[in-house]
Amino acid sequence: GVTFDTGGLNLKPGNSMRYMKKDMGGAAIAIALFLIIKNYLKKSKIKLIIPIAENSVSSNAMRPGDVLKSFNNKTIEITNTDAEGRLLLADALTRAELFNPKLIIDFATLTGAARAALGEDLPAYYTNSNEVAKKVESTVYSKSIWRMPLHDAYMQKMQSDVADIVNASSDGMAGSITAALFLKEFLPYKKVNWIHIDTYAWSSSFLN
């Protein structure tokens, strides 16, 4: 969860920063869901990983052009310091390997692009498993969430000359998809079932 997001050195304008204390919305959803499941399923083997940071401006803040090493040793070129949430999620996804999961679910208020594409009522979700997608579509909530494609061809937008991957594409296109593709690169093993839910659609509500 990003407890407050200024955008870092790629600073957000004031009107975009006003309610960025809500950028921990994905973490809040994950914690609430975890507590509900643990309460009703006493023998549940569910595990919760919450990476936490504040994205601020300081003398040691990450800078555009920096190269960071992730938990799985992949290197990441920082092209935009306001694409920080995916850096936290990347390490959390890799760390999930410690629990040998059959399914990984992540929640994040990750991209404005998801809300631009689907509006304020439909969170986008991505999955590498059609079986998982079928289960989502079979629920009563299937009309309230929308599957988006993991279009692998867009990985070319994430290429770096100095690192394994960039943290954000520079052309501004397909921002939600490229963010999901970035996360996919940090799954602990390729065959693990995974679903990424971009909850930024809901973030416009001041009640959140």
What are these regions, as identified by a protein language model?
Residues 1-208:
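A generic structural signal for tightly packed, nonpolar segments enriched in small/aliphatic residues
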